[in-house]
From Swiss-Prot:
Residues 746-757 have a biased composition (Basic and acidic residues). InterPro entries: HTTM-like, HTTM_dom, RmlC_Cupin_sf, VKG_COase, VKGC_lumenal_dom. Residues 734-745 have a biased composition (Polar residues). Monomer. May interact with CALU. This is Vitamin K-dependent gamma-carboxylase. One of its GO terms (biological process) is negative regulation of testosterone biosynthetic process.
Length: 757
């Protein structure tokens, strides 16, 4: 983006009228100052030819090569993890009845063995990029499989996966193999040769856009108000801030406001020489924190690797020059770069420089069009209206990172037989491998279409599919996202038109959030509350679990009629009124007001409270026996409290078994929490080693199948069992797999007000 100091100035033409000496001196000083700050002068922008010359200015390739190496290396680590190579057989196993969510319905996964081949090609492409071996071909070998896998599954889309594809696309057109590459060893013309400035401009511009647009998106009122990541401040990383700030102020000032300021300013801080050290410090601290806060794979490390792109292009040579001479022999050359045909060299005194050729013109056009496109796409939602729900645009390319947090309270899928009219219900997520379809109209349409093709196998003819999905976004009321009266199989959906069956977000109720927080804080630890908002003419059918012995509904706004189904009674509630709900029965809540109704369920899980009291009594009894204050003998059924479960001994009661399980779990948590750093680091390494081991073994099996044919099912089962082994981990370690392969944190546990609440 910026041209660093040392740029050649354009010499004035000899036929121009000489100006007075003071004017020339003043102009020279101004030009030099502008070049020092921005890296270019106004004369570099005076004509298209000047712009082309500027963007193709010869630049040191060292910085670009370091980024190429680091980015490709991180992609090698990413492929088995977030790209899913280690669990590929679970996702694309042949013969599964699975509903998938590609960008285009024509996109289909290949048979499993061929999918492993696709990933192998992608891995080899990343390896070639890293080494600079057959560089251009390696970029293509990585890029095409990457975008195929990316477009194959919208449920895995996120901003950083999209960014990886963009960076790989950019590198494909760049001369990043002109330094520290195998190609340079094999081809003298590419070894230590200049690269055009636009190679850096595109990459710097991309990273600048990621930061700045992310900051602009955080100007959203929810982010500024501190609602987007409200609970993040509970993480131990924010403990130093909580020494001087409350948790609420830490969330508002540190998480939200500082995050906003950093995103808005990071690109500018990195751009200018004077502020770059400050920018490098803060963005490095920011990404190191993110690596611990979120399961986002290689993203923090890719951003850390991109930060030096803003530094002087020759910084790797300066670093090599400071190394011991013996070490310098193993490192890339520190010699000055050589001329390259990819660059345009300014004319020297008395000589006319070469004019920019077609390749130089194309490089400049690519740079300008690409950056303009990247500035436009995050705001192109008016074109892709079908993807707009409560948030705008296709998820993943708008850079609205962490701005919206959702909680799903209730999901119900109803099917109706088109011939008999028979109604039935499906488990949410049946025939899928993801939960993300619940938030997006395009995926819901794909899911309904898929279900309509699968249900006839289960004697459901011409199925109609209805979804009742309740979502809260950024701590608002739980409300319906889609119209539950619409058959989504027959519903109209277009990527370029607004989806009519998406319910609007009730923004008018946003000010209620402060009051809702006050209500929550006023309740005791055993009392739970769920806040509901519903549209006129709709109703909620709900079931109160028998465990909830004390459940009431209270109206906050509007007017509702509550029907107790078993008792065949109706009661209308006005604002502020409430009524008790019987446990173990269904009820319906009808919104009869002309405006949306708001109400809340307040309930106590009496079964859970009783269990907690019993467990607390057992814990107290155990402590009394251990410290000698309880001298009487324990009943036989309580002996396991002291001795644990003994084979052949008395059978513990269910309560004692629950107590012992909890004790073991708490002890394991405490052991892991207090384990020394080297043990935790070893566990981390062993988990990653398992991921890479399984990726390699399963890939070897599939490539063998393609080359030699599949062996017997018995042999395949033995080979897969061997691939699933964890030979490096201690026996007592848990068998949790691929902690980094998921980009989405688990949702909160469902409540008990409904079978799915």
């Amino acid at each position: 983006m910026a041209v660093h100091r040392g740029s050649a100035l354009v010499a004035p033409a000899s036929d121009k009228v000489q100006k007075n000496k003071s004017a020339q001196t003043s102009g020279l000083k101004q030009g030099s100052r502008m070049e020092k700050i921005l890296g270019f002068e106004w004369t570099d922008l005076s004509s298209w030819q000047s712009v082309v010359t500027l963007l193709n200015k010869p630049t040191d390739p060292a910085n670009l090569a370091v980024f190429r190496f680091l980015f490709a290396f991180l992609m090698l680590l990413d492929i088995p993890q977030e790209r899913g190579l280690s669990s590929l057989d679970r996702k694309y196993l042949d013969g599964l009845d699975v509903c998938r969510f590609p960008l285009l319905d024509a996109l289909r996964p290949l048979p499993l063995d061929w999918m492993y081949l696709v990933y192998t090609i992608m891995f080899l492409g990343a390896l070639g990029m890293m080494l600079g071996l057959c560089y251009r071909l390696s970029c293509v070998l990585f890029l095409l499989p990457y975008w195929y896998v990316f477009l194959l599954d919208k449920t895995s889309w996120n901003n950083h996966s999209y960014l990886y594809g963009l960076l790989a696309f950019q590198l494909t057109f760049m001369d990043a193999n002109h330094y520290w590459s195998v190609d340079g060893l094999l081809n003298a013309r590419k070894k230590n040769a200049h690269v055009p400035l636009w190679n850096y401009t595109v990459l710097r511009g991309q990273i600048f856009i990621v930061y700045f647009i992310a900051g602009v998106k955080k100007l959203d009122a929810d982010w500024v108000g501190g609602y987007s990541m409200e609970h993040l401040s509970r993480h131990w990383l924010f403990s130093p801030f909580k020494l001087v700030l409350s948790e609420e102020l830490t969330s508002l000032l540190v998480v939200h406001w500082c995050g906003l300021l950093l995103d808005l300013s990071a690109g500018f801080l990195l751009f200018f020489d004077a502020s770059r050290p400050v920018g490098l410090f803060f963005v490095s601290y920011f990404h190191c924190m993110n690596s611990q806060l979120f399961s986002i794979g290689m993203f923090p490390y890719v951003m850390l690797a991109s930060s030096p792109l803003f530094c002087s292009a020759e910084w790797p040579r300066k670093l090599v020059a400071r190394c011991p001479k013996r070490l310098q022999e193993l490192l890339p050359t520190k010699a000055a770069p050589r001329p390259s045909a990819s660059c345009v060299y300014k004319r020297s005194r008395g000589k006319a420089g070469p004019k920019p050729g077609l390749r130089h013109q194309l490089g400049a056009i690519f740079t300008l069009l690409y950056l303009l496109e990247q500035l436009f796409l995050p705001y192109s939602h008016f074109l892709t209206q079908g993807y707009n729900n409560w948030t705008n645009g296709l998820y993943g390319y708008s850079w609205d990172m962490m701005v919206h947090s959702r909680s799903h309270q209730h999901v119900k899928i109803t099917y109706r037989d088109g011939l008999t009219g028979e109604l039935g219900y499906l488990n949410p997520g049946v025939f899928t491998q993801s939960r993300r379809w619940k938030d997006h109209a395009d995926m819901l349409k794909q899911y309904a279409t898929c279900l309509s093709l699968l249900l006839p196998k289960y004697n459901v003819t011409e199925p109609q599919i209805y979804f009742d999905i309740w979502v809260s976004i950024n701590d608002r009321f739980q409300q319906r996202l889609f119209d539950p009266r619409v058959d989504i199989v027959q519903a109209v959906w277009s990527p370029f038109q607004r989806t009519p069956w998406v319910q609007p977000l009730l923004m008018d109720l946003s000010p209620w959030r402060t009051k809702l927080q006050d209500i929550k804080s006023s309740l005791d630890n055993h009392t739970e509350v769920v806040f509901i908002a519903d549209f006129p003419g709709l109703h909620l059918e709900n079931f109160v679990s028998e465990d909830l012995g004390n459940t009431s509904i209270q109206l906050l706004q509007g007017e509702v009629t509550v029907e107790l189904v078993a008792e065949q009674k109706n009661q209308t509630l006005q604002e502020g009124e409430k009524m008790q709900l019987p446990a173990g029965e269904y009820h319906k809540v009808y919104t009869v007001s002309s405006s949306p109704s708001c109400y809340m369920y307040v309930y106590v899980n009496t079964t859970e409270v009783a269990l907690e009291q019993d467990l607390a009594y057992l814990q107290e009894l155990k402590e009394k026996v251990e410290n000698g204050s309880e001298t009487g003998p324990l009943p036989p059924e309580l002996q396991p409290l002291l001795e644990g479960e003994v084979k052949g001994g008395p059978e513990p009661t269910p309560l004692v078994q629950t107590f012992l399980r909890r004790q073991r779990k708490l002890q394991e948590i405490e052991r892991r929490r207090n384990s020394p750093f080297h043990e935790r680091f070893l566990r981390f390494v062993l988990r990653k080693l398992y991921v890479f081991r399984r990726s390699f073994l399963m890939t070897r099996i599939s490539l063998r199948n393609l080359l030699l044919g599949r062996p017997s099912l018995e042999q395949l089962a033995q080979e897969v069992t061997y691939a699933n082994l964890r030979p490096f981990e201690p026996v007592d370690e848990s068998s949790a797999s691929n902690t980094d392969s998921s980009n989405h944190p688990s949702e909160p546990d469902s409540e008990h007000v409904h079978s799915e609440f």
